Regions:
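Bacterial Sec-type N-terminal signal peptides, specifically the leucine/valine-rich hydrophobic h-region
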Residues: 17-20
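Phosphate-group recognition and catalysis centered on beta-loop-alpha active-site segments
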Residues: 23-391
Length: 391
């Protein structure tokens, strides 16, 4: 498997507006535009800098502003998590629950201002998502037109107070809008910009009649991106839907991995399926992953665990993945104290909002041989790559 192919990318212009009518239950169609050639280049470059939900340390996550900032700061690829609306559009949100309430009715977490919009607030509901009961507002209960009336807000304001002034400024983008932005910025920058979509809760969405897989592949195909040469990586924490999409596309696929727990489709399969993520990262498990995927996306602690507050000795995962012909893209390298090992925090370590020694953390993982990484601040990631010296 060659994960850095050489190819010319034909890029179309940015759409100025979106259609609000779903066609065949998929995302809106791109508009034809003059073709602009970008010089042949190896894509993606290694190490690969992947903007986790955009520049989410600097702008509210999963907004065009966050993706734009990330590209301007040097990201090779932007990542939209994908959920479906009632009328079948794919939109970029970390969860289908765009606001979650506590038992007392207060907001536990929110990525939109829906709670302040009485005309839509009546859609409040309680559902079980992947075995967890959630009370809040969910994308599958509203149309794209309804979702477009809302505005994004910062998900973790206590850690990212600098993003709060941007609350209420940006819409929730569709997958098509994210692709349009990537193509437009590629023309502007003269380099390929990739997209790294994640299907969120695919078993759940299939159970309610809104399967994500065909919708995603149809949008990629409509953009000329349903091929192994396309600047696309498709990812999921589940297994079955990645295998299903392998039958629909030759685009690159990445199996996401967690240091604990099980893929939810394994859980949903019942007692006949007993495997966990731990089984997928054995040498035999990785060889099976390689039958449908081009790479793995493990949590960073699966590559280098934290021991006594500091990064410890790398595990064998990267080497074992390479032996199975799989690339490794780790998640998530974030700049704030809240997410760093104790020895890399900036004093006072108790202030979770402060930026710590994130460059050092990133370079430690590069030294361990990862092929790429997800980061919340692309400028920091680019600085780490630029100054990295392999030992």
């Amino acid at each position: 498997m060659k994960h850095t192919p050489l190819f010319n990318v034909a890029l179309t212009g940015l759409l100025s507006a979106i259609a609000l009518t779903a066609c065949g239950g998929s995302d809106e169609a791109p508009v034809a535009a003059p073709v602009v050639a970008v010089a042949a280049a190896v894509f993606p470059p290694v190490p690969t800098l992947i903007a986790h939900r955009g520049a989410s340390a600097l702008r509210p996550e999963h907004t065009l502003a966050a993706y734009t900032q990330a590209i301007d700061d040097g990201a090779d690829i932007i990542e939209p998590d994908l959920v479906a609306t009632k009328d079948g559009f794919l939109v970029a949100r970390h969860e289908n629950a765009i606001a979650i309430l506590n038992a007392d009715g207060s907001i536990r977490e929110s990525t939109t201002d829906i709670a302040t919009r009485p005309e839509i607030a009546s859609l409040l509901t309680t559902k079980v998502i992947d075995g967890t009961s959630i009370r809040g507002w969910l994308t599958e209960d509203m149309t794209l037109a309804q979702l477009k009336t809302m505005r994004a807000v910062e998900r973790i304001p206590a850690i990212r107070p600098g993003n709060v002034p941007f609350n209420g400024e940006f819409q929730v983008p569709t997958l098509q809008e994210v692709i349009d932005l990537a193509k437009s910025k590629a023309i502007e920058k003269g380099r390929t910009i990739g997209v790294y979509p994640e299907t969120k809760h695919p078993t759940y969405f299939k159970s309610i009649g809104l399967p994500l897989e065909r919708r995603l592949i149809d949008v990629l195909a409509a953009n000329g991106w349903n091929s192994k040469e396309a600047p696309v990586f498709i990812q999921s924490f589940e297994v079955g839907n990645l295998k299903e999409m392998r039958g629909m596309t030759t685009a690159r696929i990445v199996q996401l991995l967690s240091s604990a727990g099980r893929p939810f489709d394994f859980v949903a399969a019942g007692p006949s399926e007993t495997r966990s993520y731990a089984d997928l990262v054995t040498p035999a498990g990785l060889r099976e992953v390689a039958t449908y995927a081009n790479g793995i996306g493990p949590s960073k602690d699966m590559v280098i665990p934290v021991v006594s507050g500091a990064l410890g000795t790398p595990t064998a995962l990267v080497a074992n993945a390479k032996a199975a012909n799989l690339i490794t893209h780790i998640y998530t390298l974030r700049p704030e104290n809240a997410f760093l090992p104790t020895n890399l925090k900036r004093a006072p370590a108790t202030d979770n909002t402060l930026r710590g020694e994130s460059v050092t953390e990133i370079q430690t993982f590069l030294q361990a041989g990862v092929d790429g990484f997800f980061t919340d601040e692309s400028a920091v990631g680019r600085a780490a790559i630029r100054t990295f010296v392999k030992k």
